[in-house]
Design a protein with these regions (language model features):
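Catalytic machinery of carbohydrate-active enzymes
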Residues: 1-311
Length: 311
């Protein structure tokens, strides 16, 4: 479905699929466009459950669903395009696409609809090069004379009060190789409840399965809450009120860092130079693909070093 927007102001469309982390790492693009073109309406074509974060943070005027059936023919040669989508693409002064489109089929089809300028951006960094993902995603904006975009993803949500005395923990990921062992997490939860005044918010989605319930089993229920399967637009403000965050190499960790939380990342086998969350309050514990060897003591020291805001 195409969301209605103003037809008066010039419009820029940023097309971004991918998972939560991919989108968060593209927020600097939206911020740079907004700063460079303050009178332009910036819109996103992506997955609304993720891209709606840009609406909440004031980085986009509208979000349109990339999974719309009417878009399917734009990925085929010689397709018969939906009239509504032809008119939609033709209304933009600039279209910036981060889709994987090696044969330029999508690019060719969108160009035929009449946007003034189409910029084909790299959909994923080359991990053989020591360049952070956000810098890779900002690079195409040089075609718009934007050379100084801030690579730090920042998401400011309006109307939030002081941060509560809560520490958010995300003990899972989409890959077991990225996870600190579950038993270690259980020991960490017990330690924090016994030796700190912090309340704990365990967050997760489908990837965590029953892990959160297992970690909470037998713990002090009045100081521990589980937030699982909560839509991002609802989870983000709840997360933003926490004093800090501990998690793995995940999209949720990128979200916490973008929200400005003191963030401790238990890093696994991924390329840290390319994929780590950026920010003044981010600390990374990297065991160089041997995450299981990361000790409880080291993690507790890392949490203490975050200088959490407590009330």
């Amino acid at each position: 479905m195409i969301e209605p927007t103003s037809v008066k102001a010039p419009r820029i469309l940023v097309i971004r699929g991918g998972a939560i982390g991919d989108f968060i790492l593209t927020l600097p693009v939206l911020a740079a466009l907004r700063e460079r073109f303050p009178g332009v309406e910036i819109e996103v074509l992506g997955y609304p459950r993720i891209a709606s974060l840009a609406l909440s943070g004031g980085l986009a005027k509208a979000v349109h669903a990339i999974e719309s059936p009417g878009l399917a023919m734009f990925f085929a040669r010689g397709g018969s395009f939906d009239l509504e989508w032809r008119e939609f693409f033709g209304q933009f002064a600039i279209v910036i696409s981060y889709l994987f489109d090696p044969d330029k089929i999508f690019e060719t089809n969108v160009k035929s609809c009449g946007p003034c300028q189409f910029i084909a951006a790299q959909h994923r960094p080359d991990e053989a090069k020591p360049i952070h993902a956000s810098d890779v995603f900002l690079k195409p904006l040089e075609q718009l004379t934007i050379f100084d975009g801030d690579p730090v993803a920042r998401l400011e949500l309006p109307g939030l009060g002081k941060r509560k005395n809560w520490l958010a923990l995300h003990p899972g990921s989409g890959s077991e190789s990225k996870n600190w062992p579950e038993q270690n997490w259980r020991e960490l939860v017990a330690h924090l409840l016994d030796h700190s005044p912090l309340n704990l918010l365990l967050i997760g989605g489908e990837a965590e399965g029953d892990r959160l319930q297992r970690l909470a089993n037998g713990m002090l229920s009045d100081r521990l809450e589980i937030a699982q399967h909560i839509p991002l637009p609802e989870l983000a403000p709840r997360l933003a009120k926490c004093a800090g965050y501990v998690g793995h190499d995940t999209g949720m960790t990128h979200l916490a860092a973008a929200l400005g939380l003191p963030t401790l990342v238990l890093w696994g086998p991924s390329n840290e130079t390319v994929w780590r969350p950026l920010g003044e309050k981010v600390r990374v514990l990297n065991q160089h693909s041997e995450l299981a060897k990361l000790t409880l003591e080291t993690v507790v020291e890392g949490i203490n070093a975050l200088e959490l805001e407590q009330f």
